[in-house]
C-alpha cells in the first residue's frame, strides 16, 4: 500500500520564457470565441472548451477523458493579430532596444572586456548615439547610423532623435516594430546580453501567441437558476478575444490607420491588465460593479497570494481550536482535550499481531463511542467508514485502523502569534469532558497565554515518526530551558508561588494529618522514574521520594508532633544542592534573622523562604538545576509535585484571599502621605516663582524650560516615592497584597504605593500633560498654570479614587500606551518575519560549522564555541587573592607553599622534593595569569603583585557562559565522597587538565581555575576517587552541551532576537539634554537591521588619552576642538541696519569704537564702494570665554572668509557690548532680501570643530575613573586622527561609517555591540551566539547587508526563496528572463515542492552496507518452542528481547525482573533476585528439573559451565565490575566486548529504550572521548580504590 506512494524528488527548476512554438505545441485548443456556453453546453473554441478540461460534474475532459477531479486541466492559446508587449518586461525591452542598433540590430559597442549581462552591456551602450559595432581591420562592423532616444509612455515606447522632442519628431514603437528589430538580433549578440538561446530569446518578451489557462485555474460558479458567474480571468480573456477579433477585422478591411492603432492599443491594454492590473499611470480594468479585476500577478503576490498563502503554508487536517482554561491538577506535560475533539481526531495505527485484539475492540465501539475508531483502511487501499458496517469487519495484519485520540497520545499544541519555538510544544493528551482545552498554569508563559478568552490550536500527528519526533524533541519538559537566554521559560507562577512562600515561612507548622494529606496530594505513581541522565546518577543515597525520611523526624516532637513546611516540601525535591537568596534579602543581615538565605543540601531544605528567585523561571534557580542535573522528566515532576502539594495546602490548610482591607493604610501613614504631597506642592509653587523671577539656574545641555521641567519632575516623583515607601512600611507582614509582591507572583511595590498612597505624575510622550489650547490643559484651569494638578499630577490613590480632571489625565496616559502597543505589534511582526527569512536556512552541519542551504559558510563554529545555549550556565572566574589561591611555591615564598599535614604524606613528599613538578606548577600559573589578566609580561613568578599591577580582562569581569557549573559539581563531590585531606597526585591533576582541554579558551580557563592543583588539594580537599568523578562529570557535561548537527540555528537566532523586540517600547522617552539621548527600542532595532545611512541620533563615545582623560579641564579643551562652532553659536543676536554714514554710525552703542577706528583707518580700503546696509553681530562674552577665543579672531575669520570685498570692524574686548560690524561692497541687488541671505550665510560660517558634530557632552566613566566625551553627530575618521583621542576605545553608533572607516570586521563587532545595547537596555538578555550569527549573516559578504529586500534578498539565494519574501512577481519574471536554474537545496524551495525539507531529522541519510545483509539472522518469533531455548532473539519495537544469557530472565515472571527501578533491580533483597522469590522457587513448574528444556544435561545449562555458575564472580550481585559509574565499565571498553559471555547487550540496564542510555543522548555518543579507551589513564590507576568504594556503597541498596 505504501510502496506505491514513493515520489520522485524534484532536484532543480529551470525558469525560462515560452517561445510561440512551445505555446502552440503545448496547447490543446485554439480559442476564438469570447462566449462560454452555446445551447446550454460549453462552446467549442470558447473559453471553457471541453478540450481544456472541465470543472463541471456533468462533463468529461475531451483531451484526457478525466472527470472534474482527476483532470488537471490543459492549456489553450489565442493567436494575437499583432505582437504585444509583455507588461512585466517593458523596462527590459527598452533596455535591449538601447543596447542594439535601431536599424541593423547589432550591439552598438565593441564586445571586448565587458561581462555579458544585460545591465553591463546596457550601462555601456545607453549613451552611444551612433551604431559602432566591433572594431575591424577596415573600420567598424556597425552600420554607423545615428541612434534615436527611446522613452516609455504608458504601455508604448517612443523613439525620437536627440533634440527633436516635439510631437512631429516622435515615432510610436508598437510591438510589431520592436519584434522586427529583436528578430534580427544574432544568436551571439543575444547570448552576450545575457539571454539563453534555448530558454529565453529577446523576441520572446513580445507576445505573439497568448497562453490560455485551463478552466481549473478559473472555475465558474453556477448560481441558483441558470446564471453563471465567471472568474475575473475568464472575463479578461473574453475582452482580449473580442478586441483581437476587431483588430483583425479592421486590418483586413483596410480601415484608416488611426482606428487600427486605437484597437491595437486597446488589445495591448487588455493583455497588460490580464497579466498585471496594478500598473502605475494606467487606469485599472474594472468589473461592472466597479471592483478592480484580480490579475495573474495579484494571484501570486502578498500574504494571501499563491506563494505565501498556499505553498509556504497551508491549512491542515487534524487540527482543533478552542478556548483555553486553567486546570491546577493537570500535569505540566498534559493538555486536557474535550471528548468531542478526541472523537474526530484519529491516529492511523497499523494492525499487527500484538495490537489486533485492542484495535478490534475499538472498531466494534465505532465512531460515536470513545475510545473507538472512525475508519479502517484495507490493504488494497479501500477505506471503510465505521458509521455504517462495523459489525462484519474482520481485521487482518497490515490493515490500518484510524482510532480516536486517547489519553496519553502525543499532540502538538500551539498559540499564535508563534514568536519562538516554545510557542509550539508537544503535550500528552488527556481526554476530558466539557468544551475547552485544559492547561497547566506554568506552561502559559512560553505560550504567552492568559485565560481571558485566548484560543489555542491542537494538531494530531499522523505517523509514528512524527509522534516520535514530537516526544523526543518538542515535548514540554524538553523545552523548559530555552536556548534564547539559556534559562528556564517556565517556573512556578500565580497562587502556587504565593503559597510556596507562605508554605516555607518559619512559622508554618503542620500536624500529622495535614502532612499525610499533603504527601498524598503529590501523585506517587512516578516514584520509580530514572534519576536523570547526568553522570551524577552514581551518587544517590537511597531513592528520591523516601517518605519515611520525612515522617521519622518531625521538627517538634512534644507536646505534639509537628512538621515544618520546608520539611514536607523537601519530599518533592531530588537530591540537589542549592544556595541562593530570597527577594527580601538584606546584605547587612549576617545572622540570617530574616530567613532569606536559601540552603538546600541533598534535596533537604535547611533554611530560607522559597519565592520567585528560587522557584520561578530564573537563571540558576531550582528548575534550572533540576533540568540540567536530573533531566527533563524530573523537572516536569518537580512542577507537578509542587503544584499539587501547594494547591492542597492553599485549599485546605492555609487559604489566601485579598480584599479591600489589604489596601487601606493606617491613619498615621495617611498623615505622612498628605504631608509629603503638601510639601511637594509648596516646592512646586516656589519653583514656579523662581522661574518667573528668573532666579532658576539652567542645567547643562538644557534650555531654561527643560531645566524647570526637570526640577519639577524630581520634586513630584520624590513625593510619590516618599508616600509610597511609607505606605509599604505601614502594611503588616501578613498583608495579602504585600505577600504577593514579596513572593513575586503578582505586582510590584509601585502598584502598592499607587493603590494605597498616591498615583503620581501622568506622562504623554515622556513629558507632563501638554497644554492643549490657549495655554491650558483643560478649560477650567487658568492660563499658563504650571502647577502639578493642572499638568497631570494625580495626588489621590486608587483607593480614594481620582478627581474628574485626574481621571481625564490618567486616561490620556493610558491611551498612549494602547496606541503604542498596537503600532509596535505590526512593526515587530515585520522585523521578526524579515529576520526569519534572512536566517531560515542557516543550519549546523556535522562539523559544527553553520552554513546556508547553498553551502555558504556563515560561521566556522556555531556561536564560536560549538555549544547549544540550552545547556549553558553562567559562571564567574574567581580572581580574589589570586596568587595565594592558585600559586604553589615550595622552594621560595613561605606563604605560598603547601604545609605538611594539609595534604596526604605521599602528595606532600612529591611536592617538597620534585623540582620538575615545581616547574610544571610555575607553567600552569603563568598560563592562568596570561589568560585572565592583561598587564606587564611575567618576568618571574612571584615578583609581581597581581592584585595591584594587573587588570582582569574584560571578558572575565562579568559572568561567562559554560556547560558545567563547577561550584555545584565540586559541592556535590565534597558532600558525597567523605573527604578529609587531598591525596590526588599533582601530576594526575595536570594530566586531567590536558585530558579536558578544549578548543574553547573560556572553558579552559574555567577548568584550570576550578581544578587548579592548589585548589583541588587545599580548598576542595578531593581524593582520587572524587577527583575522577568530577573529571567524568565535566567531560560528560561538555559532550552533552555540544550543538546537535542539523539544528536550525538560523531560525532559532531570528526568534531569539525577534521575540524580545515584541517586549520593547516603540518610542523611547528621555529627559531632554541628557547626554544619553540615543535612539533605543524598536526604532533603533530597525536602524540596525536596515543598515540606515542617516540615523536619528548619530553619536560617538570618545575616550581621551591619559593626560586629557584625567582632568575635566583638559577634557574641555578637546571638547572645544571637536564641537562644531559657527558664528551664529557665538552671537546673542544679529541685525541689519540701513546706516548710510560709512565713516560714522547712527547706532549710539557703537559710536565710540567706530569713531576710534576711522581716526586711523586701514589705508587700502575704498570706502566709497561699500554698501549702506550694515550687518551687526552682538557676541556673547560667556561663550567666547568658554571656547577660549577672542573677538579679534572672530573678526579676522570673517574677513578671511568674505575675501577683499568686505569691511569688518569690531569693538574693544573690554567694551560693554561685544560687537562685530560687517559691510559688503555694493551689489546690483540692493534689496533687503539680498542682505538677509548674506547675513544667514555669514552666521553659518564655521569657526572651528568638526562640521557634523553638533554638540559634545562631557561624562565620567565611573569604572575607569576618567572623563570621556559623548557627541551628537559623527565624524569617526577625523576624530581618530586627533592625537588626544584614545582611538582604541572610541566608538560610534553608525555602522555604515564604521564599515567605511575601519572595515567589515569592525562593523561586525559594532552590530553585536549595538544589538546588545538595545536588548540589554530593555532589560532582556539574549545569548551571545544568536546575535553573533545575525551579525555574521549581515557581514559575511564583505559589505554590510541589511535585512531587507535590498540586502539579504538581493544576493546568493535562488529565485524561489527570494520570491517567497517580497517582490514576488518581479523576481520570477527576472528569473525567466535570464533563464535561471534554481537548485532545490534550501528550505523554502523544498516546502514549495511539497518535499521533506533538509533540516533537523529530515537531513539524515541512512547508509546501508548491502553485503552485511547477506549475513543477517532472520527475525524469529519471540515465543520459545521447547526445543529451541538458545535461539538468538532480536528485539523489535513491539517485542521485548530476553537473551538466554541475560542473568535476570525468568520465564515465569517477566514483570518483576523487568522493573524499571534501578534500585530494586540490583538490590540483593529484591524479589526478583531473592532465593525465596516465588519466581525462583525450585518447585516452580518452569524450573522443574524434569522439564525437557531445562534438563541438567543440557549443554547450555550445565551447572559446571563457568559463566552460569551461581558462585561465579560475574554474577555476584555485589560484584565490583557491575558498578555503572565505574569508569572501566565503558561500552567501548575492550574487556566488555558484546561477545563476552558475561555482558549481554540486551540486559535491561542497557536497554536501548532506557532514557538514561538513549542512543540520541549526546552524552552517551559511542564516539564520546570520555568513554574512549584513552580514558584508561583514569580507570586503571585507581581501579582498586573505585572497587572498594563501590563495595561500600552497594550494600545500602543505592544501585
From Swiss-Prot:
Biased composition range(s): Basic and acidic residues: 1585-1599
GO molecular function: DNA binding; DNA-directed RNA polymerase activity; metal ion binding
Residues at which Zn(2+) 2 binds: 101, 104, 131, 143
EC annotation from Swiss-Prot or TrEMBL: 2.7.7.6
Low complexity composition-biased segments: 1435-1446, 1467-1581
PROSITE patterns, per database record: RNA_POL_II_REPEAT
Major localisation: nucleus
Keyword Nucleus among UniProt keywords: yes
Keyword Magnesium: yes
Enzyme class (EC, first level): transferase
Region described as Bridging helix: 804-816
SMART domains: RPOLA_N
Sequence repeats: 1473-1479, 1480-1486, 1487-1493, 1494-1500, 1501-1507, 1508-1514, 1515-1521, 1522-1528, 1529-1535, 1536-1542, 1543-1549, 1550-1556, 1557-1563, 1564-1570
GO CC annotation: mitochondrion; RNA polymerase II, core complex
Residues at which Zn(2+) 1 binds: 61, 64, 71, 74
Family of the protein in this entry: Belongs to the RNA polymerase beta' chain family.
Domain comment (free text): The C-terminal domain (CTD) serves as a platform for assembly of factors that regulate transcription initiation, elongation, termination and mRNA processing.
Known partners and oligomeric status: Component of the RNA polymerase II (Pol II) complex consisting of 12 subunits.
Name of the molecule in the record: DNA-directed RNA polymerase II subunit RPB1
Organism of origin: Encephalitozoon cuniculi (strain GB-M1) (Microsporidian parasite)
Amino acid at each position: 500500500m505504501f510502496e506505491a506512494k514513493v515520489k520522485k524528488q524534484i532536484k532543480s527548476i529551470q525558469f525560462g520564457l515560452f517561445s510561440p512554438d512551445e505555446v502552440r505545441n503545448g496547447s490543446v485548443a485554439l480559442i476564438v470565441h469570447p462566449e462560454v456556453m452555446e445551447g446550454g453546453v460549453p462552446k467549442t473554441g470558447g473559453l471553457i472548451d471541453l478540450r481544456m478540461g472541465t470543472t463541471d460534474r456533468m462533463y468529461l475532459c475531451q483531451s484526457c477523458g478525466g472527470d472534474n477531479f482527476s483532470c488537471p486541466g490543459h492549456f489553450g492559446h489565442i493567436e494575437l493579430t499583432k505582437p504585444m508587449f509583455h507588461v512585466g518586461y517593458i523596462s527590459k525591452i527598452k533596455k535591449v532596444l538601447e543596447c542594439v542598433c535601431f536599424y541593423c540590430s547589432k550591439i552598438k559597442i565593441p564586445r571586448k572586456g565587458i561581462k555579458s549581462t544585460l545591465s553591463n552591456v546596457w550601462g555601456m551602450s545607453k549613451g552611444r548615439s551612433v551604431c559602432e559595432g566591433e572594431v575591424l581591420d577596415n573600420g567598424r562592423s556597425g552600420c554607423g547610423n545615428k541612434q534615436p532616444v527611446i522613452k516609455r509612455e504608458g504601455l508604448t515606447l517612443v523613439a525620437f532623435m536627440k533634440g527633436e522632442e516635439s510631437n512631429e519628431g516622435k515615432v510610436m514603437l508598437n510591438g510589431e516594430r520592436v519584434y522586427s528589430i529583436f528578430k534580427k538580433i544574432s544568436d551571439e549578440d543575444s547570448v552576450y546580453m545575457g539571454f539563453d538561446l534555448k530558454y529565453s530569446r529577446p523576441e520572446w518578451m513580445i507576445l505573439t501567441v497568448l497562453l490560455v489557462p485551463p478552466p481549473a485555474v478559473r472555475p465558474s460558479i453556477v448560481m441558483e437558476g441558470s446564471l453563471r458567474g465567471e472568474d475575473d480571468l475568464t472575463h479578461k480573456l473574453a475582452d482580449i478575444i473580442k478586441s483581437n477579433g476587431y483588430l483583425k477585422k479592421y486590418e483586413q478591411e483596410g480601415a484608416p490607420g488611426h482606428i487600427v492603432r486605437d484597437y491595437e492599443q486597446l488589445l495591448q491594454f487588455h493583455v497588460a491588465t490580464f497579466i498585471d492590473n496594478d500598473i502605475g499611470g494606467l487606469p485599472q480594468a474594472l468589473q461592472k460593479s466597479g471592483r478592480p479585476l484580480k490579475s495573474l500577478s495579484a494571484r501570486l503576490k502578498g500574504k494571501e497570494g499563491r506563494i505565501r498563502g498556499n505553498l509556504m503554508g497551508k491549512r491542515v487536517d487534524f487540527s482543533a481550536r478552542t478556548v483555553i482554561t486553567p486546570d491546577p491538577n493537570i500535569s505540566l506535560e498534559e493538555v486536557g482535550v474535550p471528548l468531542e475533539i478526541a472523537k474526530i481526531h484519529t491516529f492511523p495505527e497499523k494492525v499487527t499481531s500484538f495490537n489486533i485484539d485492542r484495535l478490534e475492540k475499538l472498531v466494534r465501539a465505532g465512531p460515536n463511542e470513545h475510545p473507538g475508531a472512525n475508519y479502517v483502511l484495507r490493504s488494497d487501499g479501500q477505506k471503510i467508514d465505521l458509521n455504517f458496517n462495523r459489525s462484519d469487519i474482520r481485521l487482518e495484519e497490515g490493515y490500518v485502523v484510524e482510532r480516536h485520540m486517547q489519553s496519553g497520545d502525543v499532540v502538538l499544541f500551539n498559540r499564535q502569534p508563534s514568536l519562538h519555538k516554545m510557542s509550539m510544544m508537544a503535550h500528552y493528551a488527556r481526554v476530558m469532558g466539557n468544551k475547552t482545552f485544559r492547561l497547566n498554569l506554568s506552561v502559559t508563559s512560553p505560550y504567552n497565554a492568559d485565560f481571558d478568552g485566548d484560543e489555542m490550536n491542537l494538531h494530531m500527528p499522523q505517523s509514528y515518526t512524527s509522534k516520535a519526533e514530537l516526544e523526543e524533541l518538542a515535548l514540554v519538559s524538553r523545552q523548559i530551558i530555552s536556548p534564547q537566554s539559556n534559562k528556564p521559560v517556565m517556573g512556578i507562577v500565580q497562587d502556587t508561588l504565593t503559597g510556596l512562600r507562605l508554605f516555607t515561612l518559619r512559622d508554618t507548622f503542620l500536624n500529622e494529618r495535614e502532612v499525610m494529606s499533603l504527601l498524598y496530594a503529590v501523585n506517587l505513581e512516578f516514584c520509580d522514574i530514572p534519576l536523570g541522565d547526568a553522570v551524577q546518577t552514581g551518587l544517590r543515597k537511597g531513592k528520591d521520594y523516601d517518605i519515611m525520611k520525612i515522617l521519622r523526624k518531625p521538627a517538634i516532637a512534644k507536646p505534639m508532633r509537628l512538621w515544618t513546611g520546608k520539611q514536607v516540601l523537601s519530599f518533592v525535591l531530588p537530591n540537589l544542592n542549592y544556595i541562593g537568596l530570597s527577594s527580601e534579602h538584606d546584605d547587612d543581615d549576617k545572622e540570617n534573622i530574616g530567613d532569606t538565605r536559601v540552603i538546600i543540601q541533598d534535596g533537604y531544605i535547611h533554611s530560607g523562604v522559597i519565592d520567585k528567585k528560587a522557584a520561578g523561571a530564573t537563571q540558576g534557580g531550582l528548575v534550572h538545576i533540576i533540568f540540567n542535573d536530573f533531566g527533563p522528566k524530573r523537572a516536569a515532576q518537580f512542577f507537578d509535585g509542587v503544584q499539587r502539594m501547594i494547591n492542597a495546602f492553599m485549599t485546605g490548610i492555609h487559604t489566601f484571599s485579598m480584599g479591600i482591607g489589604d489596601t487601606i493604610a493606617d491613619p498615621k501613614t495617611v498623615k505622612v502621605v498628605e504631608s509629603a504631597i503638601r510639601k511637594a506642592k509648596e516646592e512646586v509653587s516656589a519653583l514656579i516663582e523662581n522661574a518667573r523671577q528668573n532666579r532658576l539656574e539652567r542645567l547643562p545641555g538644557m534650555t531654561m524650560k527643560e531645566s524647570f521641567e526637570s526640577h519639577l519632575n524630581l520634586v513630584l516623583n520624590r513625593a510619590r516615592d516618599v508616600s509610597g515607601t511609607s505606605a509599604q512600611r505601614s502594611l503588616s507582614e501578613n498583608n495579602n497584597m504585600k505577600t504577593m509582591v514579596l513572593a513575586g507572583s503578582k505586582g510590584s511595590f509601585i502598584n502598592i504605593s499607587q493603590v494605597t498612597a498616591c498615583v503620581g505624575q501622568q506622562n504623554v510622550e515622556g513629558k507632563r500633560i501638554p497644554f492643549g489650547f490657549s495655554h491650558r490643559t483643560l478649560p477650567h484651569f487658568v492660563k499658563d498654570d504650571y502647577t502639578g494638578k493642572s499638568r497631570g499630577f494625580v495626588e489621590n490613590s486608587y483607593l480614594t479614587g481620582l478627581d474628574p480632571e485626574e481621571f481625564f489625565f490618567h486616561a490620556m496616559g493610558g491611551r498612549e500606551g494602547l496606541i503604542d502597543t498596537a503600532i509596535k505589534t505590526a512593526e515587530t511582526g515585520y522585523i521578526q518575519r524579515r529576520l526569519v527569512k534572512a536566517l531560515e536556512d542557516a543550519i549546523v552541519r556535522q562539523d559544527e560549522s553553520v552554513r546556508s542551504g547553498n553551502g555558504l559558510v556563515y560561521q566556522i563554529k556555531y556561536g564560536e564555541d560549538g555549544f547549544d545555549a540550552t545547556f549553558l550556565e553562567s559562571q564567574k572566574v574567581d580572581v580574589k587573592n589570586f596568587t595565594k589561591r592558585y600559586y604553589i611555591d615550595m622552594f621560595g615564598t613561605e606563604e605560598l607553599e603547601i604545609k605538611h599535614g594539609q595534604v596526604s604524606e605521599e602528595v606532600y613528599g612529591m611536592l617538597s622534593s620534585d623540582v620538575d613538578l615545581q616547574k610544571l606548577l610555575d607553567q600552569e600559573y603563568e598560563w592562568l595569569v596570561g589568560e585572565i589578566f592583561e598587564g606587564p609580561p611575567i618576568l618571574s613568578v612571584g615578583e609581581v603583585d597581581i592584585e595591584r599591577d594587573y587588570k582582569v580582562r574584560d571578558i572575565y569581569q562579568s559572568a561567562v557562559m559554560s556547560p558545567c557549573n563547577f561550584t555545584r559539581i565540586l559541592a556535590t563531590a565534597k558532600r558525597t565522597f567523605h573527604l578529609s585531606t587531598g591525596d590526588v597526585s599533582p601530576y594526575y591533576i595536570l594530566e586531567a587538565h590536558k585530558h579536558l582541554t578544549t578548543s574553547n579558551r573560556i572553558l579552559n580557563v574555567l577548568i584550570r581555575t576550578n581544578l587548579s592543583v592548589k585548589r583541588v588539594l587545599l580548598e576542595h580537599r578531593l581524593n582520587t576517587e572524587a577527583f575522577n568523578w568530577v573529571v567524568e562529570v565535566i567531560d560528560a557535561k561538555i559532550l552533552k552541551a555540544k550543538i546537535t548537527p542539523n539544528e536550525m540555528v538560523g531560525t532559532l537566532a531570528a526568534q531569539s532576537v525577534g521575540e524580545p523586540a515584541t517586549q520593547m517600547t516603540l518610542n523611547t522617552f528621555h529627559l531632554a539634554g541628557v547626554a544619553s539621548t540615543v535612539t533605543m527600542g524598536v526604532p533603533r532595532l530597525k536602524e540596525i537591521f536596515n543598515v540606515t545611512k542617516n540615523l536619528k541620533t548619530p553619536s560617538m563615545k570618545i575616550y581621551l588619552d591619559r593626560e586629557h582623560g584625567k582632568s575635566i579641564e583638559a577634557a574641555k579643551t578637546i571638547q572645544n576642538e571637536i564641537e562644531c562652532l559657527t558664528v551664529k553659536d557665538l552671537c546673542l543676536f544679529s541685525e541689519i541696519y540701513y546706516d548710510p554714514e560709512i565713516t560714522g554710525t547712527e547706532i549710539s552703542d557703537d559710536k565710540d569704537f567706530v569713531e576710534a577706528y576711522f581716526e586711523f583707518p586701514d589705508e587700502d580700503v575704498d570706502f566709497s564702494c561699500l554698501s549702506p546696509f550694515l550687518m551687526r553681530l552682538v557676541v556673547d562674552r560667556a561663550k567666547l570665554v568658554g571656547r577660549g577665543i577672542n573677538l579679534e579672531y572672530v573678526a579676522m575669520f570673517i574677513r578671511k572668509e568674505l575675501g577683499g570685498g568686505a569691511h569688518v570692524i569690531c569693538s574693544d574686548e573690554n567694551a560693554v557690548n561685544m560687537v562685530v560690524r560687517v559691510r559688503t561692497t555694493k551689489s546690483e541687488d540692493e534689496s533687503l532680501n539680498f542682505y538677509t541671505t548674506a547675513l544667514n550665510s555669514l552666521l553659518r560660517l564655521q569657526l572651528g570643530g568638526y562640521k557634523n558634530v553638533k554638540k559634545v557632552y562631557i561624562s565620567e566613566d565611573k569604572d575607569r575613573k576618567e572623563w570621556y566625551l559623548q557627541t551628537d553627530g559623527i565624524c569617526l575618521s577625523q576624530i581618530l586622527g586627533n592625537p588626544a583621542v584614545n582611538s582604541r576605545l572610541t566608538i560610534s553608533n553608525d555602522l555604515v561609517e564604521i564599515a567605511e572607516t575601519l572595515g567589515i570586521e569592525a562593523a561586525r563587532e559594532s552590530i553585536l555591540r549595538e544589538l546588545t545595547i538595545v536588548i540589554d537596555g530593555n532589560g532582556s538578555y539574549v545569548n551571545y551566539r544568536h546575535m553573533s550569527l545575525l551579525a555574521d549573516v549581515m557581514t559575511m559578504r564583505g559589505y554590510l547587508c541589511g535585512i531587507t529586500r535590498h540586502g539579504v534578498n538581493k544576493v546568493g539565494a535562488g529565485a524561489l526563496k527570494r520570491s517567497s519574501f517580497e517582490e514576488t512577481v518581479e523576481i520570477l519574471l527576472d528569473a525567466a528572463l535570464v533563464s535561471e536554474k534554481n537548485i532545490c537545496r534550501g528550505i523554502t524551495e523544498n516546502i514549495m515542492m511539497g518535499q521533506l525539507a533538509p533540516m533537523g531529522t529530515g537531513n539524515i541519510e541512512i547508509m546501508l552496507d548491502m553485503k552485511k545483509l547477506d549475513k543477517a539472522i532472520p527475525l524469529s518469533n519471540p515465543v520459545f518452542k521447547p526445543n529451541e531455548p538458545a535461539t538468538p532473539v532480536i528485539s523489535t519495537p513491539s517485542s521485548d528481547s530476553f537473551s538466554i544469557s541475560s542473568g535476570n530472565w525468568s520465564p515465569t515472571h517477566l514483570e518483576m525482573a523487568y522493573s524499571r527501578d534501578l534500585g530494586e533491580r540490583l538490590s540483593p533483597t529484591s524479589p526478583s533476585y531473592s532465593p525465596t522469590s516465588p519466581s525462583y522457587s525450585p518447585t516452580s513448574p518452569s524450573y522443574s528439573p524434569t522439564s525437557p528444556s531445562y534438563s541438567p544435561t543440557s549443554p547450555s545449562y550445565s551447572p559446571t559451565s563457568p559463566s552460569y555458575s551461581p558462585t561465579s564472580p560475574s554474577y555476584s550481585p555485589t560484584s565490583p565490575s557491575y558498578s555503572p559509574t565505574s569508569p572501566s565499565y565503558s561500552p567501548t571498553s575492550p574487556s566488555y566486548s558484546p561477545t563476552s559471555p558475561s555482558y549481554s547487550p540486551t540486559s535491561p540496564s542497557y536497554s536501548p529504550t532506557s532514557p538514561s542510555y538513549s542512543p540520541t543522548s549526546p552524552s552517551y555518543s559511542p564516539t564520546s572521548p570520555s568513554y574512549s579507551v584513552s580514558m584508561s589513564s583514569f580507570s586503571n590507576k585507581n581501579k582498586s580504590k573505585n572497587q572498594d568504594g563501590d563495595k561500600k556503597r552497594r550494600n545500602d541498596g543505592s544501585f
